[in-house]
C-alpha cells in the first residue's frame, strides 16, 4: 500500500514539474504578444495597445490609429 501511494505521489510531482516547464516556455514564447491588437483595431505607436506581430500602426486618420498588415516593405 505504501508503495502505491509513493508511486502516485512521485508521478504527481513529475507531472507538476513537466506542466510548470511547459507553461514557462509558453509564457516566454508569447510574452511580447500580451496586450496587442490585430488588424483594423485601434492602436497607438507611443503607448498601449500596440499591434501584434505582422501588423503596424498607421495614423492615416489621426487620432484614430489602426493596425494594418505588414507587407514587409
Swiss-Prot record:
Domain of life, source organism: Eukaryota
Coiled coil stretches, renumbered: none
Keywords: Amidation, Disulfide bond, Ion channel impairing toxin, Knottin, Neurotoxin, Presynaptic neurotoxin, Secreted, Signal, Toxin, Voltage-gated sodium channel impairing toxin
Principal place of residence: secreted
Cited Pfam families: Toxin_7
InterPro entries, sorted: Beta/delta-agatoxin_fam (IPR016328)
Localization in the cell: Secreted
Annotated S-S bridges: 36-52, 43-57, 51-67, 59-65
Gene Ontology MF annotations: sodium channel regulator activity; toxin activity
GO cellular component, one term: extracellular region
Role: Insecticidal neurotoxin that induces an irreversible spastic paralysis when injected into insects. Modifies presynaptic voltage-gated sodium channels (Nav), causing them to open at the normal resting potential of the nerve. This leads to spontaneous release of neurotransmitter and repetitive action potentials in motor neurons.
Entry domain remark: The presence of a 'disulfide through disulfide knot' structurally defines this protein as a knottin.
Protein name: U3-agatoxin-Ao1j
Lineage, broadest ranks: Eukaryota, Metazoa, Ecdysozoa, Arthropoda, Chelicerata
